[in-house]
Regions:
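Compositionally biased, low-complexity flexible segments
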Residues: 1-31
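Generic recognition of cysteine residues
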Residues: 2, 56, 85-88, 178, ...
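Generic detector of short alpha-helix boundary/capping microenvironments
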Residues: 17, 41, 51, 325, ...
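Generic detector of N-terminal low-structure segments
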Residues: 21, 36-37
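Iron-sulfur-associated redox domains of electron-transfer enzymes in respiratory
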Residues: 30-36, 95-428, 432-499
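Iron-sulfur cluster-binding cysteine motifs and their immediate structural context
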Residues: 38-50, 54-78, 83, 87-102, ...
């Protein structure tokens, strides 16, 4: 079970690496390719509470982008590599990693408050609770209206089908719904950027529709409408604040499911005795199914597909795509959290239980009468609603230098350093692998003696040299072996005889 792992505000001791947020354009990628690099995000939801950190190196061993180092006994998060997947939150035994997001009272700054519940929210409740009750419960928490992200997932499904049906496109297409996966591609697999399906994630589509409809319904300006996402993971919190592929945010904040679940559960219980619902259910069961791994593919149901969940499994699939082994596929649903969004670190329910509930809801939930079909709704909408606004670019993360010549020189030095390291990947140096330590040394962020094995070998060599030096005499005092024996005999002969 993934328990609550949130923080409403950033503690003074919550920090990131010393070079946080500093990147440069036109950098050399980790594989030697020169890319036009995007400036790294200035905001990350995942933070370190330094006072709790024991320097145990669990986080550095599990981070999929090697974005964490342990320096002076404390972890540091490197902004340029962090994808906010939350793996460090999941594995830290000291709860030194946390996620920052908005508190529920943040909605009070707006005249009209709209909630965007993630489909994963429905999986947090037991089987007797229908999504209708959850939507109504949100009104009791201070929201004026609700727009289901699952409804937007129904619309996005239609656009994805259209992309798959196109001819002459690069294959396989990779889902853009998981922001941690999109950032993983930016950071670690820049050659796969063109594989990302050019369709917005459901949460952004939902936000744009919800703001427009609320402004019209309540007669207010769009900027007077506060649109808040109920998020299952820190990656989506970051994506809302620092969206990739867009000119700016479409939402006003994100509230962790773990934070809102308690008051929402009480509101749902209080409403059980009431008949009817105030909020119309507009999503289909297939839209709700996007909350679990395989749900997106079930909804799209077109072409040759695979679904992969768990960030380390995703990395394995992406490596195969780079090698050309999966060119026969049409679509890859890739989710960083095991089990899908129901496995996010900002949820409260066991991911396996929640996944089962979502699967049941996929069959049970239907939109109410009068709701247009997704196909009808999409035909009436501007195509720009579903498109990225700017190209997605690689992030300067594994770059060794700013130009190819210097990068090659540093790569040669890196290989020489790596040859002298033990290759044990023990993490005692504060880097996750020997390769990562060699990269840090080349960048001037570490030294070879940070490796305990290199340090021990040098100490042993120094001790041996000191032993040899201690036996040596200055040249003026030096005598050959024959001369030393002759002097010893003469001393013995000069001794007085014993009487």
């Amino acid at each position: 079970m993934c328990g609550p792992a949130t923080a409403r505000r950033v503690p003074a001791s919550a920090r990131r690496g010393p070079s946080a947020g500093r990147g440069r354009r036109d950098q050399t990628g980790w594989n030697g390719t020169l890319f036009a690099m995007e400036q790294p995000s200035q905001f990350h939801a995942v933070r370190l509470i330094q006072d709790r950190c024991k320097g145990c190196v669990n986080c550095i061993k599990h981070c999929p982008t090697e974005a964490i180092r342990v320096r002076a006994g404390k972890a540091e998060i490197l902004d340029v590599r962090c994808i906010d997947c939350g793996e460090c939150i999941r594995v830290c035994p000291n709860h030194a990693k946390t996620a920052v997001a908005d508190a529920l009272d943040a909605i009070g700054s707006f005249r009209v408050k709209v909630a965007l519940p993630a489909p994963a929210l429905y999986g947090q409740f037991d089987d007797s609770v229908h999504p209708q009750q959850v939507l109504d419960g949100l009104l009791d928490l201070g929201f004026d209206d609700v727009f289901e992200v699952a409804r937007a997932a129904d619309l996005v499904t239609v656009k994805i089908r259209q992309e798959i049906e196109k001819g002459g496109i690069i294959r396989p297409l990779i889902s853009s719904s998981c922001p941690a996966v999109v950032r993983l591609i930016q950071v670690r697999f820049p050659n796969l950027i063109d594989h990302i399906v050019p369709v917005s994630a459901p949460v952004r589509v939902a936000a744009r529709i919800a703001r427009r409809e609320a402004a019209e319904k309540y007669g207010v300006r769009p900027d007077e409408v506060g649109v808040f996402f109920l998020s299952p993971c820190p990656a989506k919190v970051t994506a809302i604040r620092e969206p990739v592929g867009y000119l700016g945010p479409a939402l006003d904040g994100a509230i962790p499911i773990a934070d809102i679940f308690g008051p929402l559960a009480r509101a749902v219980r209080a409403r059980r005795s009431q008949e009817g619902g105030k909020v119309k259910v507009t999503a289909s069961g297939l839209g709700v199914g996007w909350a679990r791994a395989g749900g997106e593919n079930q909804a799209v149901a077109l072409g040759r597909q695979i679904s992969v969940d768990g960030v380390h499994n995703v990395i394995g699939i992406f490596e195969d795509i780079e090698r050309g082994r999966l060119s026969g596929l049409d679509y890859v649903e890739a989710l960083a959290c095991t089990g899908g969004c129901v496995g996010g670190v900002l949820t409260v329910e066991n991911s396996f239980i929640a996944r089962r509930r979502i699967r049941i809801l996929t069959e049970k939930v239907h939109p109410e009468e009068g709701v247009p079909t997704p196909e009808e709704a999409v035909r009436a909408m501007d195509d720009a609603l579903f498109r990225h606004e700017v190209p997605i670019e690689p992030t300067a993360s594994f770059a060794l230098a700013g130009d190819m010549r210097e990068a090659i020189r540093r790569m040669e030095r890196l290989e020489a350093i790596l040859a002298g390291l033990p290759g044990l990947d023990c993490g005692s140096c504060g880097a996750p692998t020997c390769q990562a330590l060699a990269e840090d040394i080349v960048r001037g962020e570490a030294v070879e003696t940070d490796c305990v094995f290199v340090l021990r070998a040098r100490v042993q060599r120094l001790a041996s040299e000191l032993g040899e030096l201690s036996a040596k005499l200055p040249p003026a005092m030096h005598r050959s072996e024959g001369e030393q024996e002759k002097q010893q005999v003469e001393r013995l002969l000069s001794l007085p005889e014993e009487r």
